[in-house]
Amino acid sequence: KDAGIQPMADVVLNHKAAADGLEEFEVVEVDPMDRNKVLTEPFTIQGWTKFTFDGRNGAYNDFHWHWYHFTGTDYDASRNKNGIYQIQGDNKGWAHGDLVDKENGNYDYLMYADIDFKHPEVVENLDQWAEWFIETTGVEGFRLDAVKHIDSFFMKNFIHNITKKYGEDFYVFGEFWNGDTETNDEYLESIDYLYDLIDVALHQNLFRASQEGENFDLRTIFDGTLALNHPEEAVTFVDNHDTQRGQALESTIEEWFKPAAYALILLREAGLPCVFFGDYYGIEGKFAQESFQEVLDRLLWVRKDLAYGEETDYFDDPNCIGWTRSGSEESAPIACLISNNQAATKVMEIGSSYAGLTYYDVLENCSETVQVQEDGTAEFPVAERSVSVWVAQDTEGQ
């Protein structure tokens, strides 16, 4: 905080693992591909659902978790058998189908012991935990993991209580891993737009663009995205821990396109961009990836100091798109250009008041300079399968 950084916590509310003991309870086994399809009559299993936290010795509270605080689990210790087991009992069952993702019929269950957000003791305990956690750690925001698996009615009330107590500046966004436009619209409505969502559709578009190269129409890069449809609620990203190579949702943006992808999230008005640790510092091991620190530092500098003002798009060619930002009282306009095919140029307007001003590519992908003409336009180049970010030559700070 002393450095001007707002600390946030990555909060996993969906499930609990590493229980302290086994319990017996009644379940039915369901089809993994359709969790609404029951495969068995009710029977008894032994599951890891007893959480007593003996090592804490009651230091924080005396709440213990038991089988009736969960909706399901994935392992029967008595038979040494894996499966998806829906816990039976009063007011049990998955969350209502309209409150969770509809993949696999009902995607309430993800893994381990799945928390039952309908249970009043669970709701009370999590509200108390949130207050304790925020005041103990001093965090000023939450990243909510796996929200498409969590009852959205609970999430709306949970976050409402937090922001009511700690203010609207307590920033919250959710990992809602679904790229469908209508589904995102419905989810945002269901939570009353109380928190933002990661822009999965944009990531998927960036991935396709990197895979398809010149066959991808760059004019469609924002189609169906939160950045386009809900710019104030979009958390934009290029890659993350789930999409990197070797992970469950592997869809890594090809290296040749990553600088362009980051320009698209860092230098535009829409969305709150997030830079992936692995892209900045690189990744080692079996699925190694180079570091993009140098190009990211330059893009981040442009974002921080120069990427202000009205945005004008030049999305007029399937293989070459550009945009300008009109600048501020302290900074001249900037221009960005992306090509997924051959080298190209595009005439874009900077403003007649900047006539004679010389521009250079801060990414150094183009070595020449460009001068703004008397009419306020300039013809900016971009190299083959590349990105260029053009800034005024007398700009300080880089």
Where on the chain are the PLM-derived regions?
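Active-site-adjacent "subsite" loops/lids of carbohydrate-active enzymes
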Residues: 65, 95-136, 147
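Short N-terminal helix-initiation segments at or just after the protein's N-terminus
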Residues: 85, 116-120, 176-180
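Short charge-dense sequence patches
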Residues: 72-83, 101-111, 207-217, 246-250
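Core domains of carbohydrate- and sulfate-ester-processing enzymes
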Residues: 29-106
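Active-site-proximal helices and loops of the catalytic beta/alpha 8
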Residues: 1-9, 14-15, 24-64, 128-398
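Solvent-exposed, charged interface segments at domain starts and junctions
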Residues: 88-111, 252-260, 386-388
